[in-house]
Amino acid sequence: MFEYLKGIVAKIDPAYVVLDVNGIGYKILCPTPYSYQENQPATIYVEQVVRDTGITLYGFLSLEDKELFLKLLSVSGIGPKSAVAIMAAEDTDSLASAIQNGEVKYLTRFPGVGKKTASQIVLDLKGKLGDYVKKSAVATDLTPSLQDALLALVALGYTQKEVDRITPKLAKLPENTADGYIKEALALLLKK
């Protein structure tokens, strides 16, 4: 019903924000409520979910995040609260990359996601997030030292899937030497 709401952020809670739109306060459950600032204007992309227990608004920073939420909802066994919890636990680029690469073990890290549900997520969504993953990869401009580090990781025996999953995180770090990137990459890879 709603695509987005524009207004002033009236309140921020760990699970939701209250957005004042022309004097009406909308409670919107968000995976990342602290991305907004109180008493500041905001546009929140929303999805209205109607259940027997009530009507709930779920909000997102971007239209792409909202689309990822809807795709997670299409998976058997994933409800709106689980989808928000999954999106809150990890940045969406890494999440989309893990699904695209079929990393079931990685997906079991999320709250309420066991091996069966993780397998179902991969089964239902693998191949359907290509545009989302490509957008994040194209937006990432890799420095020569980062490219060298990624090649070294593959030479060390890590799979291309594992390297692709951590590449967006490494690209967001301050520019470093190849050795510095390798140390950061190993810390991320061993953190599984």
Curated annotation (Swiss-Prot):
Tell me the segments the record calls region Flexible linker: 137-140
Q: Which cysteines are joined by disulfide bonds?
A: none
Q: Where in the cell is it found?
A: Cytoplasm
Q: What is its main location?
A: cytoplasm
Does the UniProt entry include the keyword DNA damage? Answer: yes
Q: Which GO terms describe its molecular function?
A: ATP binding; four-way junction DNA binding; four-way junction helicase activity
Could you tell me which residues belong to the region Domain I?
1-61
UniProt region (Domain III), positions on chain: 141-192
Cite the domain annotation text. Has three domains with a flexible linker between the domains II and III and assumes an 'L' shape. Domain III is highly mobile and contacts RuvB.
Q: What does this protein do?
A: The RuvA-RuvB-RuvC complex processes Holliday junction (HJ) DNA during genetic recombination and DNA repair, while the RuvA-RuvB complex plays an important role in the rescue of blocked DNA replication forks via replication fork reversal (RFR). RuvA specifically binds to HJ cruciform DNA, conferring on it an open structure. The RuvB hexamer acts as an ATP-dependent pump, pulling dsDNA into and through the RuvAB complex. HJ branch migration allows RuvC to scan DNA until it finds its consensus sequence, where it cleaves and resolves the cruciform DNA.
The protein's name in its UniProt record: Holliday junction branch migration complex subunit RuvA
